[in-house]
């Protein structure tokens, strides 16, 4: 044997697992694009003045086994105390059937946001279930398919209240004083940039105020009191004040729906429906509204429509409200939400059904009653007379109680003067209540659970009669069919089969970076060491998290060329918002708060102008030249015109047009010359890592899409993570947190509910970087560039590649111009996108950043075989367009305009001018491995004109 021990140890094994093409395949591809090596190709494409001499040092790579062992040792430093802190977070029980078949299933977690509904019907149905749960429990008319977290939802409710308010001169937003503190923190952050005056007081005090456009109430206060706000809401409605209510999804199973009491909006966290606390996330927020306000709602909304055959089909409705279309005029900057977590919550409701859910809520409440009465009989005073699951217990010797709790490995809420807080959960059992009683009393007296249970069956008054829910909920068959594990498993599998995810085919979406989410990266998110921690637990109990976050932050600092990284933003859009806030606060600290203009190239992603608007900035668009690059003449003119009002520029690199702009350093210099800051959008970081870096280029701040470049899966539309890196001068202006103070958090207000955002998915990115190492990360970027150029080279004779760099190359993605084909032959980018489904592919990004185009991003994870399959499909489709051009098929009847084709058409009457085989088996590969779309092409116009965003009525099933 001629190999050394080092070679046999195979430390770089994961690199070869992550990168799809072999060395031999890469040689063939390099020859096609005219390069001798990956380094040669990189030197031909990347401007020399921004190229790093060596990749940043994040260490060597590790095997999967080594990295998992290292991370397990780190995770074991976390202390898994029983948490009764509450404050919007509670232990939850995720049924194993959902854990295995959804959360740990790549068929669910590797899908993309359902912009292509024909290949997304499974998760669209699940999201419709989520909306139905929200509608039923809140008592309102329409719901969204998730927001980022409860605190963000509160901020969105405030913004929406202002949009829909008829009191146009009012600028005050009133918040009841027993809202969760982290929610108030985020609301204040948003209000600051909108110029709203936030007033916090006891709820009834709002009636004494003028100039109030909206009110935020919390049905179950943060310290446990259950409020009947029906009368107050009625009085507020008489004054035309918009009312939002924060609600607990578990409590709503027993409590009157706020919508029935007159609330205009109801929101909260769905975490308690089977999603672990995870040190703060990810968790789906729910959001519901009255029907009359639906076009002002934030977030994605799933609607019922029909397909080309007239069959019922689902789609994302009313997209004209959203950032990718309305840009700075959008209702919100939300792009990625929390689809995977919403689907978990929806399946939790499906599995338990109405009776099961009420049983769980009833058990939580009964145990709370038992503990409450037991403590009262032992001489304790409860601060409130009403509760669902949370007690605020007054204690004479708080230090002694907390010492006993520490010894028993129990966390209580400690921030209430002269009292401790206790929130029970689905995970609480009678032995836990007995243990809590002993901790509080400090005696050997044992709580008599059985006796108190009998007493409380007839005499519990902790929920006022007026607040008890009396209506039926979750009557739809989906919540009443799948209560055995066999049925539930099959239901989830049936939905999974309707979707096209990375476990079946390449998803070549430009600007989305749909790369491998390796199994080894995903394993740690199911570990209890990461799952069970409350985000507000004492820092000494989260040492494992702190070490993991510190290491990941250090690696990201190295890779970006920045000085500090903040992990709080829980999506890319939130990262943009946080970065722009840092810029705003920096200018204010220098007495330059008048700087408010944000320059944005015309090619920018829609979140950029939407985020700038949210940050209180004025958007000024900078033109691009005919090559797709930022027009430096126009940029300088706009910067000079802005003068001392220039705040920043938001620029994506490589550009959204898919090229490395040669003048990026000049762009940075011009902005700095006029006193502005450079925000470099990290959406295309997959073409930078190890090759260049935003801090090295000259930028001041960037967000990083960990769900793109650093392997967190898209989850069908979330979760995401958008940490921001900044230069040292912006570091003091990064987000802080009102509840948790520790190293890494500033004194600024928060942008997310939890101090470290969706912390429990950060191990995915930690694993990726640890296993790839410095050289592996650079090789990944280089391979992504190679794959994109290989596609462009193979397709350029049949499709126009819209933009290239000065030497004819693209970056990590390429834009195919379909406009000439549409003008000459009548075939659109939509027709090609839908026809690709028949070939077994998800479509590239349509009409972004240029209308009438397809943007293709293959990533480094796809093999040459799969890339060739995609190229061959595109060439075959071009040949089909040729048949239309020659008149062999009419423009009205051909396999492109009729695509996609469904299985039922094989056994239906066939009147088309092309064969069934041409329709559904266009290649030999599709005969061997066919993906069948569940529906034909969606009728978008019908869906928006006949908006229906809940499950079909029960009568349809009778």
Curated annotation (Swiss-Prot):
Gene Ontology biological process: glycine decarboxylation via glycine cleavage system
Keyword check for Oxidoreductase = yes
Q: A single Gene Ontology molecular function, please? A: pyridoxal phosphate binding
Q: What is its EC number?
A: 1.4.4.2
Annotated coiled-coil segments of the chain: none
EC class of the enzyme, as a word: oxidoreductase
Q: Catalyses which reaction?
A: N(6)-[(R)-lipoyl]-L-lysyl-[glycine-cleavage complex H protein] + glycine + H(+) = N(6)-[(R)-S(8)-aminomethyldihydrolipoyl]-L-lysyl-[glycine-cleavage complex H protein] + CO2
Q: At the top level of its lineage, which domain of life is listed?
A: Bacteria
Gene Ontology cellular-component terms listed: cytosol; glycine cleavage complex
InterPro entries assigned to the protein according to its UniProt record, in alphabetical order:
GcvP, GDC-P_C, GDC-P_N, GDC_P, PyrdxlP-dep_Trfase, PyrdxlP-dep_Trfase_major, PyrdxlP-dep_Trfase_small
Tell me if GTP-binding is a UniProt keyword of this record.
no
Tell me which residues bear N6-(pyridoxal phosphate)lysine.
708
**Cystine residue pairs:** none
Give the required cofactors: pyridoxal 5'-phosphate
Alphabetical UniProt keywords: Oxidoreductase, Pyridoxal phosphate
Q: Which PANTHER family match?
A: GLYCINE DEHYDROGENASE (DECARBOXYLATING), GLYCINE DEHYDROGENASE, DECARBOXYLATING
Recorded family membership: Belongs to the GcvP family.
Q: Which NCBIfam families does the UniProt entry name for this protein?
A: gcvP, PRK04366.1
Q: How does it assemble?
A: The glycine cleavage system is composed of four proteins: P, T, L and H.
Q: What does this protein do?
A: The glycine cleavage system catalyzes the degradation of glycine. The P protein binds the alpha-amino group of glycine through its pyridoxal phosphate cofactor; CO(2) is released and the remaining methylamine moiety is then transferred to the lipoamide cofactor of the H protein.
Q: What is this protein called?
A: Glycine dehydrogenase (decarboxylating)
Q: Which organism is it from?
A: Photorhabdus laumondii subsp. laumondii (strain DSM 15139 / CIP 105565 / TT01) (Photorhabdus luminescens subsp. laumondii)
């Amino acid at each position: 044997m001629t190999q050394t021990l080092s070679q046999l140890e195979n430390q770089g094994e994961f690199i070869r697992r992550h990168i799809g093409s072999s060395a031999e395949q890469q040689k063939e591809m390099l020859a096609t694009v005219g390069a001798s090596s990956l380094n040669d190709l990189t030197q031909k494409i990347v401007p020399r003045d921004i190229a790093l001499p060596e990749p940043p040092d994040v260490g060597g790579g590790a095997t999967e086994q080594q990295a998992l062992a290292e991370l397990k040792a780190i995770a074991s430093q976390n202390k898994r105390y029983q948490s009764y802190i509450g404050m919007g977070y509670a232990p939850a029980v995720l049924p194993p059937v959902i854990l295995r078949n959804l959360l740990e299933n790549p068929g669910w977690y590797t899908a993309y946001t359902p912009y292509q509904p024909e290949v997304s019907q499974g998760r669209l149905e699940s999201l419709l279930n989520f909306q139905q749960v929200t509608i039923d429990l809140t008592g309102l008319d329409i719901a969204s398919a998730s927001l980022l977290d409860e605190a963000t939802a509160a901020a969105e409710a405030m913004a929406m209240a202002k949009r829909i308010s008829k009191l146009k001169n009012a600028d005050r937003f009133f918040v009841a004083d027993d809202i969760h503190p982290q929610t108030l923190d985020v609301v204040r952050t948003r209000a600051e940039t909108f110029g709203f005056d936030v007033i916090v007081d006891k709820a009834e005090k709002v009636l004494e105020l003028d100039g109030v456009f909206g009110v935020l109430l919390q049905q179950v206060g943060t310290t446990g009191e259950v409020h009947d706000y029906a009368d107050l809401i009625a009085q507020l409605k008489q004054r035309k004040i918009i009312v939002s209510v924060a609600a607990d999804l578990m409590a709503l199973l027993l409590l009157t729906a706020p919508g029935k009491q007159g609330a205009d909006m109801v929101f909260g966290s769905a975490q308690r429906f089977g999603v672990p606390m995870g040190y703060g996330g990810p968790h789906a927020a729910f959001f519901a509204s009255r029907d009359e306000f639906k076009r002002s709602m934030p977030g994605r909304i799933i609607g019922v429509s029909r397909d080309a055959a007239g069959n019922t089909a689902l789609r994302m409705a009313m997209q004209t409200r959203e950032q990718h279309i309305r840009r700075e005029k959008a209702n919100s900057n939300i792009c990625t939400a929390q689809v995977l977590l919403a689907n978990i919550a929806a399946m939790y409701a499906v599995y338990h059904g109405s009776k099961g859910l009420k049983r769980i809520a009833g058990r939580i409440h009964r145990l709370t009653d038992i503990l409450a009465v037991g403590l009262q009989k032992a001489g304790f005073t409860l601060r409130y007379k009403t509760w669902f699951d949370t007690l605020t217990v007054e204690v004479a010797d708080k230090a002694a109680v907390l010492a006993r709790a520490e010894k028993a490995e129990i966390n209580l809420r400690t921030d209430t003067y002269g009292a401790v807080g206790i929130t029970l959960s689905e995970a609480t059992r009678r032995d836990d209540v007995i243990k809590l009683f002993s901790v509080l009393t400090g005696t050997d007296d044992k709580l008599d659970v059985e006796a108190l249970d009998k007493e409380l069956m007839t005499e519990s008054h902790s929920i006022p009669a007026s607040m008890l829910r009396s209506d039926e909920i979750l009557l739809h068959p989906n919540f009443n069919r799948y209560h055995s594990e066999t049925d539930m498993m099959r239901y989830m599998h049936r939905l999974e089969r309707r979707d096209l995810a990375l476990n079946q085919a390449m998803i070549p979406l430009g600007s989305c970076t749909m790369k491998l989410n390796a199994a080894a990266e995903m394993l740690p998110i199911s570990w209890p060491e990461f799952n069970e921690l409350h985000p507000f637990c004492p820092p000494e109990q989260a040492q494992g998290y702190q070490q993991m976050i510190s290491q990941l932050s250090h690696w990201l600092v190295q890779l970006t060329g920045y000085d500090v990284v903040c992990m709080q933003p829980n999506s890319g859009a939130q990262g943009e918002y946080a970065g722009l806030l840092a810029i705003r606060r920096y200018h204010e600290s220098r007495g330059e708060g008048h700087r408010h203009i944000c320059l944005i190239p015309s090619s920018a992603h829609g979140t950029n102008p939407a985020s700038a608007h949210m940050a209180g900035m004025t958007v000024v668009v900078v033109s691009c030249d005919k090559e797709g690059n930022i027009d430096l003449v126009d940029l300088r003119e706009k910067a000079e015109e802005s003068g001392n009002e220039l705040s920043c520029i938001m620029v994506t690199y490589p550009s959204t047009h898919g090229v490395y702009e040669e003048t990026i350093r000049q762009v940075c210099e011009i902005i700095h010359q006029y006193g502005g800051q450079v925000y470099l959008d990290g959406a295309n970081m997959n073409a930078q890592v190890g090759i260049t870096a935003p801090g090295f280029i000259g930028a001041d701040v960037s967000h990083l899409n960990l769900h793109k470049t650093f392997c967190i899966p898209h989850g069908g539309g979330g979760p995401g993570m958008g940490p921001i890196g900044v230069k040292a001068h912006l570091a003091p202006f990064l987000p802080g947190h009102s509840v948790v103070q520790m190293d890494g958090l500033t004194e600024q207000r928060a942008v997310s509910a939890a101090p470290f955002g969706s912390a429990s998915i950060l191990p995915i990115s930690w694993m990726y970087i640890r296993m790839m190492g410095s050289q592996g990360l650079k090789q990944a970027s280089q391979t992504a560039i190679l794959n994109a150029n290989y596609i462009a080279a193979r397709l350029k004779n049949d499709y126009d590649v819209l933009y290239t760099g000065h030497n004819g190359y693209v970056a990590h993605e390429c834009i195919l111009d379909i406009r000439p084909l549409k003008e000459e032959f009548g075939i659109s980018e939509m027709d090609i996108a839908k026809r690709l489904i028949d070939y077994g592919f998800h479509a590239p990004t349509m009409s972004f950043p240029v209308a009438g185009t397809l943007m293709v991003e293959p990533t480094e994870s796809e093999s040459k075989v799969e890339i060739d399959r995609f190229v061959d499909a595109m060439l075959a489709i071009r040949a089909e367009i040729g048949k239309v051009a020659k008149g062999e098929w009419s423009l009205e009847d051909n396999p492109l305009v009729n695509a996609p084709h469904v299985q039922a058409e094989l056994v239906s009457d066939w009147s088309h001018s092309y064969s069934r085989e041409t329709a559904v088996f266009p290649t030999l590969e599709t005969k061997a491995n066919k993906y069948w779309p569940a529906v034909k092409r969606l009728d978008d116009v019908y869906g928006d004109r006949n908006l229906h965003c809940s499950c079909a009525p029960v009568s349809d099933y009778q």
